[in-house]
Amino acid sequence: MYMVQENKNFATAQAKSIRVSSRKLNLVAAFIRNMKVSEALVQLTFSPKRIAKVVKDCLQSAVANAENNLGLDIDRLVITKATVGKALVMKRVMPRAKGRATRINKFFSNLYITVTEKEDN
């Protein structure tokens, strides 16, 4: 579910096909954007949003990629990008009165998180 892409001083992680609409996921992603990783992990731990647990797992994956693959200092990591994209839509049918039926769309989303090591000034 989590994939890795790394470069010089930043590491990324992505979670694909998360069973939540992109609108709801973007609320949490926008909240942690440009935040220190340590602060974001605390905020996500105590967030009342259901999807915060998945975002936290993806963020921990990005931090692990930065530490293990690139040797970055995890105390100086900042979330520079937290983007959300649309994924597939499951179409379901709900029976209604008088023999009719309506369509129900169940949305999926993709999450991309990039963490960067900031220099102390």
Curated annotation (Swiss-Prot):
Offer an example of a GO molecular function term for this protein. structural constituent of ribosome
Cross-referenced Gene3D superfamilies: Ribosomal protein L22/L17
Q: Which keywords does this chain's UniProt record carry?
A: Ribonucleoprotein, Ribosomal protein, RNA-binding, rRNA-binding
- Signal sequence region: none
Taxonomy, superkingdom: Bacteria
Q: Which InterPro entries match?
A: Ribosomal_uL22, Ribosomal_uL22_bac/chlpt-type, Ribosomal_uL22_bac/org-type, Ribosomal_uL22_CS, Ribosomal_uL22_sf
- Which GO CC annotations does the UniProt entry carry? cytosolic large ribosomal subunit
Q: Name one Pfam family in it.
A: Ribosomal_L22
Q: Please give the biological process terms from Gene Ontology that the record holds.
A: translation
SUPFAM superfamilies annotated for this entry? Ribosomal protein L22
Record keyword DNA-binding present: no
Function of the molecule: This protein binds specifically to 23S rRNA; its binding is stimulated by other ribosomal proteins, e.g. L4, L17, and L20. It is important during the early stages of 50S assembly. It makes multiple contacts with different domains of the 23S rRNA in the assembled 50S subunit and ribosome. The globular domain of the protein is located near the polypeptide exit tunnel on the outside of the subunit, while an extended beta-hairpin is found that lines the wall of the exit tunnel in the center of the 70S ribosome.
Q: What HAMAP family does the database record attribute to this sequence?
A: Ribosomal_uL22_B (MF_01331_B)
Oligomer status and interactors: Part of the 50S ribosomal subunit.
Write out the similarity annotation: Belongs to the universal ribosomal protein uL22 family.
Q: Which PANTHER family match?
A: CHLOROPLAST 50S RIBOSOMAL PROTEIN L22-RELATED, LARGE RIBOSOMAL SUBUNIT PROTEIN UL22M
Give the protein name, as stated in the record: Large ribosomal subunit protein uL22
Tell me which species this is from: Rickettsia massiliae (strain Mtu5)
As recorded in Swiss-Prot or TrEMBL, the protein's gene is named rplV
